[in-house]
């Protein structure tokens, strides 16, 4: 598989840093087998492309995963788990759904004030959901009665389940839906007999990514191998 370097752009996580990515060839279909190998080397998927940071002045991004058999809930996570036992979860193939898109728009307005579901964000949403690169992707749809309150896009490969993106009802923040989605994915990964839940990149110093270190044990891909990260925030 061929790879290319992206053009540099501002880092979305750390100020005063530029982001440079290694990207897979968009003319080649990823497929589950190829992506499984790439995921284990620190790559992630966005639409039909696999990518990995290759920033010239920074190596803060650490690909992380949870060994699901060894994970134990802490007190706060246990409360979130119990609080959301009234939710139903359906596993679906990726598809367009207007209610999901509307929920995504509400979530984006919370995460990016002043934004919303404009034409560009709608296009990005469609690409994220529908362009899977030949990878076995699923939508996890969390509902309260008949109302969809959270949606998680995940990939399934032999190495485990990879959490691609999760969005949820911002007005239900007291439920901890983002945390519950991760906890549910861990239980589901275990039920599938798979070893790891991949959470993407953890970036020390980024408030957006700090939540990932609360799941223990947490393994990071550092210096070409996976290892358990220390309880403190520094990965190196």
Regions found by a protein language model. Give the residues of each.
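Active-site/acyl-donor-binding loops of N-acyltransferases
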Residues: 52, 62-69, 196-236
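Conserved donor-binding loop and adjoining core beta-sheet/short helix segment
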Residues: 1-44, 48-70, 144, 152-162, ...
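A structural signal for short, well-ordered beta-strand segments and their strand-loop junctions
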Residues: 46, 141, 196-200
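Active-site catalytic microenvironments for nucleophilic, acid-base chemistry
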Residues: 110, 184-192
């Amino acid at each position: 598989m061929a790879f290319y370097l992206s053009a540099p752009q501002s880092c979305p996580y750390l100020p005063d840093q530029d982001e440079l990515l290694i990207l897979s060839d968009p003319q080649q279909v990823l497929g589950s087998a190829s992506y499984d190998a790439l995921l284990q080397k620190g790559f992630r998927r966005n639409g039909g492309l696999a990518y990995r940071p290759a920033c010239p002045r920074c190596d803060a991004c650490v690909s992380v995963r949870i060994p699901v058999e060894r994970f134990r809930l802490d007190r706060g996570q246990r409360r979130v788990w119990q609080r959301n036992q009234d939710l139903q979860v359906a596993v679906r193939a990726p598809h367009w759904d207007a209610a999901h898109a509307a929920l995504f728009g509400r979530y984006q307005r919370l995460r990016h004030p002043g934004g919303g579901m404009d034409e560009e964000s709608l296009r990005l949403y469609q690409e994220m959901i529908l362009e899977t690169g030949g990878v076995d992707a699923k939508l996890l749809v969390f509902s309260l009665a008949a109302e969809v309150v959270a949606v998680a896009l995940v990939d399934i490969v032999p190495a485990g389940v990879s959490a691609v993106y999760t969005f949820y009802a911002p007005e239900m923040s007291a439920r901890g839906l983002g945390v519950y989605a991760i906890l549910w994915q861990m239980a589901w990964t275990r039920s599938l007999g798979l070893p790891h839940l991949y959470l993407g990149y953890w970036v020390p110093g980024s408030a957006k990514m700090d939540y990932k270190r609360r799941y223990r044990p947490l393994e990071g891909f550092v210096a070409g191998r996976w290892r358990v990260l220390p309880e403190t925030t520094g990965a190196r």
